[in-house]
């Protein structure tokens, strides 16, 4: 979860301007100096060897903040690093324990990481440390990343480290540019050009095994997720950084060491092109993009990289491991084995083979020397001998302000993007800070006596001619640029957490969804079945009743404000199954109106006149509603005799009903949580304008949208509890499906030619896939909100009620990560949902009386009903075979007892739910409407009905004056007379809005 993120922390010149230098602190043979990076669990400092005055990086981990899993990862990292001694792997120099901290002393990599080197490639010529490099090997230009010579150099060194790991059956599992650290060229140490001289654990610590000594040296870092995995074994833990994660890991499948090769392919592509091959807002969308790409790796038209590199990238970026090249083929590829082409005359390759194999552990390596003994003594606490000597060089430390960045968990403390040349005069640590030097060289202060070598013009001219003769027109594409900006902004938010760790529950849910999706018995006749992790198969026309613009879910679409085409999916099936369609029933007309309204329930036309904090909507316009798959209009619940859902339902239909009801409730809660989430995240650059008329669409003033710390805490708490509630409902939905599937698997009943059972199975499978995708999405967002909350709480004054020290443990939310999340005692999902339901209904009722936005009134009423049903979900657990009458009887008994032991919100919702069910089924005894009204009479001020009461009594507002209208009028008048205030209007007022727009269902001749 960000603890083991070294690469972004080796940038000592990039300090916050409001942070003072930390006091020096002795740690063994080292002195800890200024802080250079901070994460959720660790702080990284610059350090210096006390005797030699050479530099190290010291990572101080606070053990009290770590969960058991993170402690295991830390112990694993220490254990692995103690065994790894290779020039292209960051070495662990020493380890010191205290009562509350572990201090890891690591090799210092002065040039930062490869990510910032790539991002700052256009400013490298401004630094004396890379000026010569860029003069010899200039950047190819637009549509490209680094010069191919530099790309091949870094790839050879990375491959050398990977071969070393493979010889020891180790997989890294988190290879990415941020974990590839760079050191100044080894030749710069010999010439005395490098100011920041790192501590050397051995003679060859900074002597490359392959590549060029005149170019920066690459080292693989961050072994927090590494593990031993023999060639015949498979792993199944999802961990690492999503953007560079292999598809098999994203799909929660077992994987082997080939997962590292995919990551190498993504890194190689980014070095060549300047961006990752697949970019998405979260790991769910990422796997969709990878699968939709179908191994067709394309390159920008202006990119002139060689065909050998393209072939290697395409061989590495195969989404199926069986199709991906193996390690033997990879290590034997000519890009790694042949000399680097295009070198200048004075950059002769090293004498070693470019892919110099490293010996196996027992084959007598270079480490069987006194140096190794010294290293082992140091790791065990012994006194370290003096390191290998360097040429005399002026060693001075310069402190530079780190640009202010949004407060985010385990963020990268890299360059602000526009680096400047280092100062001419070195200054002591206490001097005034200077501006940051170039991105990749942020930790290296400038040297006054730096010697510039004359640039070689041959390669420069060759590169320019190659670019000029490419024949590609230099056409600006503002549309693509804007799209990239929005995608990048969304990506920065989504990947603010550097790692994804999925708990066991999520893995189980995804495994069950996969089992159901790929079971042969579920495949036959599956109309409109979803593809893996998709809303609908690409190019598949939606079934009747679905939006023709269906598209896969965008988990964080709301960031950029783009319209969600798939949010227009109708929800008729959800209500067809609940309400009968008998032409002889008054309630069937009401259900028909509900069905008509449900099509707009979460569509783009949603416009209830509602506001919340900062003007958010509930639900927001742009999120993926349930169901997110094309579905036919046929209802499994409606029988030929027009009967209603009841005891006569078969098990399949009852399961479908319960499953879709639970999923729909989770969707409503999710929509409410999205309102809070939307206010916590910054908009993309091109989405500064919100929806028309939305009070919350003001320009964002800062990364937090101009929110105060108090507001961030409040919104984070509310979003978190709502997301947790949505997760519980989604988990319950999956449990319902799992019980059904277990029963079906035992009985093998799906194998028979039963049309109803097959349709039910397909429908359940569709819902399960939707639930799986939504669960993964909500889990991702809940973790983001959790980190946001934890960080915001720490920024509060110590006497603030929401400060962690002032919150009791009893109000904590269990967290499977580092520590419990503590929320304010008065923030609960049920309270928020109850108040929101009343608010929506109250405003809708006023609009209904005045005749404004009747369609929005219907939507608000139905949404509020679902929200109250979600509150009741923990009380009335719906299981297959359980009758609805028992639930209503329980609700009535609770009300008759006066609800002594239950909150008033639950009493009201129970009464309302039972009475609402009685309206659907008038033949069954129900709760009188006045019982529901009495529950809130003492809380809500009455608002008297005016002319509409008389209008309804006389039938003037009803389009049907026949017997059906009379039945509807009877129900409506009874409810309106018994409910003279709007609090219980969910169960009375909405009927009148439907009655004003209902057409006769049976053409009685009076309409």
Swiss-Prot record:
SUPFAM superfamilies: Protein kinase-like (PK-like). It comes from the Eukaryota. Residues 396-410 have a biased composition (Polar residues). The keyword Disulfide bond does not apply. Residues 534-555, 805-817 have a biased composition (Low complexity). The keyword DNA damage does not apply. It holds the Pfam family Pkinase. It catalyses: L-seryl-[protein] + ATP = O-phospho-L-seryl-[protein] + ADP + H(+); L-threonyl-[protein] + ATP = O-phospho-L-threonyl-[protein] + ADP + H(+). Keywords: ATP-binding, Autophagy, Cytoplasm, Kinase, Membrane, Nucleotide-binding, Protein transport, Serine/threonine-protein kinase, Transferase, Transport. Its EC number is 2.7.11.1. GO terms for molecular function: ATP binding; protein serine kinase activity; protein serine/threonine kinase activity. Residues 30-336 form the Protein kinase domain. It is a peripheral membrane protein. InterPro entries: Atg1-like, ATG1-like_MIT2, Atg1-like_tMIT, Kinase-like_dom_sf, Prot_kinase_dom, Protein_kinase_ATP_BS, Ser/Thr_kinase_AS. It is found in: Cytoplasm; Preautophagosomal structure membrane. The active site is at 174 (proton acceptor). Its main location: cytoplasm. Residues 373-387, 477-489, 563-579, 887-896 have a biased composition (Basic and acidic residues). One of its GO terms (cellular component) is phagophore assembly site membrane. Residues 343-489, 524-586, 795-817, 878-900 are annotated as: Disordered. GO terms for biological process: autophagosome assembly; autophagy; autophagy of mitochondrion; cellular response to oxidative stress; piecemeal microautophagy of the nucleus; protein transport; regulation of autophagy; response to starvation. ATP binds at residues 36-44, 59. Serine/threonine protein kinase involved in the cytoplasm to vacuole transport (Cvt) and found to be essential in autophagy, where it is required for the formation of autophagosomes. Involved in the clearance of protein aggregates which cannot be efficiently cleared by the proteasome. Required for selective autophagic degradation of the nucleus (nucleophagy) as well as for mitophagy which contributes to regulate mitochondrial quantity and quality by eliminating the mitochondria to a basal level to fulfill cellular energy requirements and preventing excess ROS production. Homodimer. Forms a ternary complex with ATG13 and ATG17. Belongs to the protein kinase superfamily. Ser/Thr protein kinase family. APG1/unc-51/ULK1 subfamily. This is Serine/threonine-protein kinase atg1. It comes from Aspergillus niger (strain ATCC MYA-4892 / CBS 513.88 / FGSC A1513).
């Amino acid at each position: 979860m960000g603890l083991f993120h070294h690469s972004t922390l080796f940038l000592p010149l990039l300090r916050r301007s409001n942070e003072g230098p930390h006091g020096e602190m002795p740690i063994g043979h080292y002195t800890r100096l200024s802080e250079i990076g901070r994460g959720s669990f660790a702080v990284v400092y610059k350090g210096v060897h006390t005797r030699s005055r050479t530099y190290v990086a010291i990572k101080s981990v606070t053990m009290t903040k770590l969960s058991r899993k993170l402690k295991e990862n830390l112990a694993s990292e220490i254990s692995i690093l103690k065994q790894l001694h290779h020039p292209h792997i960051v070495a662990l120099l020493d380890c010191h324990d205290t009562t509350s901290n572990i201090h890891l002393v690591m090799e210092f990599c002065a040039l930062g990481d490869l990510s910032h080197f790539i991002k700052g490639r256009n400013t490298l010529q401004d630094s004396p440390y890379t000026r010569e490099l860029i003069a010899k090997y200039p950047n190819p230009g637009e549509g490209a990343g680094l010069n191919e010579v530099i790309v091949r150099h870094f790839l050879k060194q990375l491959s050398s480290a990977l071969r070393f790991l493979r010889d020891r059956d180790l997989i890294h599992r988190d290879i990415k540019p941020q974990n590839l650290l760079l050191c100044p060229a080894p030749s710069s140490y010999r010439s005395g050009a490098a100011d920041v001289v790192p501590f050397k654990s051995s003679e060859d610590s900074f002597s490359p095994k392959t590549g060029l000594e005149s170019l920066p040296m690459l080292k693989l870092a961050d072994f927090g997720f590494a593990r031993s995995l023999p060639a015949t074994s498979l792993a199944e833990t999802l961990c690492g950084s999503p953007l560079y994660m292999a598809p098999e890991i994203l799909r929660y499948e077992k994987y082997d060491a080939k997962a590292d090769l995919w990551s190498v392919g993504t890194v190689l592509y980014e070095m060549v092109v300047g961006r990752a091959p697949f970019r998405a807002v979260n790991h769910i969308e990422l796997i969709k993009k990878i699968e939709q790409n179908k191994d067709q790796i394309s390159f920008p038209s202006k990119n002139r990289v060689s065909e050998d590199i393209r072939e290697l990238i395409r061989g590495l970026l195969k989404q199926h491991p069986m199709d991906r090249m193996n390690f033997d083929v990879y290590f034997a590829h000519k890009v790694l084995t042949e000399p680097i082409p295009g070198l200048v005359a004075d950059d002769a390759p090293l004498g070693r083979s470019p892919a110099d194999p490293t010996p196996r552990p027992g084959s007598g390596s270079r480490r069987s020397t006194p140096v190794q003994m010294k290293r082992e003594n140091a790791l065990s606490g012994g006194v370290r001998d003096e390191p290998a000597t360097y040429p005399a060089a002026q060693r001075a430390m310069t402190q530079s302000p780190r640009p202010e960045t949004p407060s985010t968990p385990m963020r990268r403390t890299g360059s602000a993007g526009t680096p400047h040349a280092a100062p001419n005069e070195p200054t002591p640590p206490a001097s005034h800070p200077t501006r940051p030097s170039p991105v990749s060289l942020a930790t290296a202060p400038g040297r006054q006596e730096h010697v510039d070598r004359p640039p070689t013009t041959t390669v420069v001219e060759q590169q320019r001619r190659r670019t000029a003769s490419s024949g590609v027109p230099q056409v600006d594409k503002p549309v693509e640029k804007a799209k990239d900006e929005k995608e990048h902004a969304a990506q920065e938010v989504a990947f603010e957490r550097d790692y994804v760790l999925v708990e066991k529950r999520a893995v189980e849910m995804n495994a069950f969804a996969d089992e159901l999706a790929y079971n042969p018995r579920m495949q036959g006749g599956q109309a409109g079945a979803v593809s893996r992790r998709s809303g609908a198969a690409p190019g598949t026309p939606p079934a009747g009743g679905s939006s023709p613009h269906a598209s896969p879910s965008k988990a964080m679409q709301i960031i950029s404000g783009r319209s969600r085409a798939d949010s227009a999916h109708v929800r008729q099936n959800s209500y067809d199954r609940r309400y009968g369609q008998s032409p002889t029933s008054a309630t069937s007309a009401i259900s028909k109106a509900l069905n008509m309204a449900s099509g707009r329930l979460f569509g783009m036309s949603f416009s209830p006149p509602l506001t919340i904090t900062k003007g958010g909507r509930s639900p927001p316009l742009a999120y993926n509603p349930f169901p997110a798959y094309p579905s036919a209009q046929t209802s499994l619940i409606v029988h030929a005799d027009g009967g209603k859902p009841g005891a006569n339902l078969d098990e399949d239909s009852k399961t479908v009903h319960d499953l879709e009801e639970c999923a729909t409730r989770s969707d409503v809660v999710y929509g409410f949580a999205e309102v809070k989430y939307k206010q916590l995240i910054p908009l993309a650059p091109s989405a500064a304008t919100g929806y028309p008329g939305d009070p919350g669409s003001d320009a964002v003033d800062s990364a937090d949208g101009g929110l105060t710390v108090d507001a961030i805490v409040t919104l984070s708490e509310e979003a978190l509890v709502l997301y947790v509630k949505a997760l519980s409902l989604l988990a319950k939905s999956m449990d319902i499906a799992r019980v059904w599937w277990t029963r079906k698997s035992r009985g093998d009943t799906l194998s028979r030619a039963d049309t109803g059972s097959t349709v039910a199975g397909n429908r359940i499978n569709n819902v399960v896939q939707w639930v799986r995708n939504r669960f993964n999405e909500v889990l991702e967002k809940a973790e983001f909100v959790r980190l946001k909350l934890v960080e915001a709480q720490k920024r509060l004054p110590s006497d603030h009620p929401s400060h962690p020290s002032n919150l009791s443990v009893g109000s904590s939310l269990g967290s499977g990560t580092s520590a419990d999340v503590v929320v304010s005692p008065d923030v609960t999902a049920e309270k928020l949902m109850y108040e929101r339901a009343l608010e929506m209904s109250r405003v809708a009722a006023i609009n209904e009386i005045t005749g404004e936005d009747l369609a929005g009134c219907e939507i608000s009423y139905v949404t509020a009903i679902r929200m109250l049903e979600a509150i009741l979900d923990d009380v009335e657990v719906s299981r297959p075979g359980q009758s609805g009458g028992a639930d209503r009887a329980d609700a009535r008994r609770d009300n008759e007892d006066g609800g002594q032991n239950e909150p008033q919100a639950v009493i009201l919702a129970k009464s309302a739910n039972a009475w609402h069910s009685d309206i659907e089924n008038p033949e069954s005894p129900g709760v009188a409407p006045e019982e529901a009204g009495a529950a809130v009479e003492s809380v809500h001020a009455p608002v008297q009905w005016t002319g509409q009461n008389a209008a309804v009594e006389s039938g003037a507002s009803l389009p049907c004056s026949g017997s059906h209208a009379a039945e509807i009028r009877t129900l409506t008048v009874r409810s309106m007379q018994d409910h003279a205030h709007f609090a219980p209007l969910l169960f009375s007022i909405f009927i009148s809005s439907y009655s004003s727009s209902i057409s006769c269902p049976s053409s009685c001749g009076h309409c």
